[in-house]
Amino acid sequence: MSGPGLKEVVISAADWTSAILPILSKGYKLRIPLKGMSMYPLLVGGRDEAVISSIGEKKPVRGDIVLYVDEDGIHALHRIHHVKVKNYYLWGDSQTWIEGPIKEDAVLAVATEVIRKGKRISCNKAAYKFFAELWLLARPIRPGILYIARKFRSFIGRISR
């Protein structure tokens, strides 16, 4: 948000999450811009956004994207790989390692939509869930897939100049 009379302020994740969680618990959703590349290729920092909501009664499951805080106080949006009892094991879509265990109370919100290049994509649609599961299953070959995708994009960029 910018413009005449508007001041842009950077607020730490710890401050905004403690302020926003009570609002999410009342049924509101929050649209947040993304930073970083850990969720590439689905989500790209500086370009895409996520719409998050309260976890509520339905606990997040494999394939869901959740907002969590790690032991160092770092907040991130990552996908659930699996759940054991009350611990979550997460990873970013471009990562090769699984993070966890992440305690249930460290999982703060769940993504209900992603906004990719301005287009809204529901995280509850069957096609989205299918893609998410495929990407989870592709874990052993993901580095190769991402390498080929980068090379292909670079090649297309060179020939289209």
What residue ranges belong to the model's regions?
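Extended hydrophobic leader/signal-anchor segments used for secretion and membrane insertion
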Residues: 1-161
